[in-house]
C-alpha cells in the first residue's frame, strides 16, 4: 500500500469515527484517538523526518489535506452534538407557565419603625421637618443647656449612663432624651423653626413599661408670637390624627426644667373609653406626653433673645404610643425579636 493510500484510509477511518460519535464524550475520545499527543494522525507527521527530501513537499500536502478533512468533519459533528445536547436539556427543563408562582417571603416594618414613620408623617403635614443628632452627647447638650441643674436627680448614675470623659473636657453620656437635638438646631439656625427629632435614648431602667434603650420624639417650634394655645391645638390635632379618632385630651400642670409653663398631656383611655379599667388604673385617662413653653434660660443658652422669640417643646415615647395604638401590653416585647410578635404587628 502506497503512503498516499494509507493516509486516505486513515482519513476515512477518522471521519467514520467522528460521524459515529453519539455525544460529546464520544467525540472527545475520537479526538484523543486521532489528534491527541499519541494520536494516529499526529504520529503521521513523524514521517517528515524520514521522508526523502524530494518527497517532503508532496507528503506535507497530503498530511495537510488529511488534517483539514478531519477538522471540518470534527467541527461539524461538534456543533451538531452541542445543539442536540442543548435541545435535550431544554426539553427536560421545560416549565409549565400555567403553574402559580412561588410565594416570596418578605420582611415587615418593625412596629417601632412603623410608629416613628406615622408620627413623622403627621407632623410633616403640619410643616415640621425631621432632624437628628448624636446618641453620645456632652453633659452640656444633654443637661446644662436644658436648664437641668447639677443636683437634679436625672443626673444621678442610677438614671443616666455615663461614659468616658471627653478628651477636650466635659463629661459624656448616652443621651437620656432627644432634647439635645433641639439645642443643636437652635444653636446653629435662626427662627422660624419647626422641627421633630425622633431617635434612641438611654436610661438605667428596666421593667414592664421601661427598657434601658427606647425611642423618643422631641418636637419644638420657635418664632415670634408663639403661645401655649398653639401648642395645645397642635398636640390635640396630632393625637386625634395618630390614633384615628377624636379623643378627649386634657393638659395637667407639671414641671420640667426646660419649659415654663409645663404640662403633662393625657387622653381618654382607648380601652375603656374613659370609664376606668386596669390599663388606665381606673382613672379613665392615659398619660401620653409632656410639653411646655421653652424656658427663657434655654433660649439664653442657645443665644436667642426670649424678648423677641418664643417657642414650645414637647416629647413623647414612641413605644408608649405604639403600645396604645397597636394593643401591645409589654414594652419589652418590642426588643425581644420574637417572630410571632413581629409577624402579628409588623406591616408588610
UniProtKB/Swiss-Prot annotation:
Its cofactor is Mg(2+). It comes from the Bacteria. Keywords: Aminoacyl-tRNA synthetase, ATP-binding, Cytoplasm, Ligase, Magnesium, Metal-binding, Nucleotide-binding, Protein biosynthesis. GO terms for cellular component: cytoplasm. Its main location: cytoplasm. Mg(2+) binds at residue 260. It catalyses: tRNA(Phe) + L-phenylalanine + ATP = L-phenylalanyl-tRNA(Phe) + AMP + diphosphate + H(+). One of its GO terms (molecular function) is magnesium ion binding. The keyword Metal-binding applies. Belongs to the class-II aminoacyl-tRNA synthetase family. Phe-tRNA synthetase alpha subunit type 1 subfamily. PANTHER family: PHENYLALANINE--TRNA LIGASE, MITOCHONDRIAL (PTHR11538:SF41), PHENYLALANYL-TRNA SYNTHETASE (PTHR11538). This is Phenylalanine--tRNA ligase alpha subunit. It comes from Magnetococcus marinus (strain ATCC BAA-1437 / JCM 17883 / MC-1). The gene is pheS.
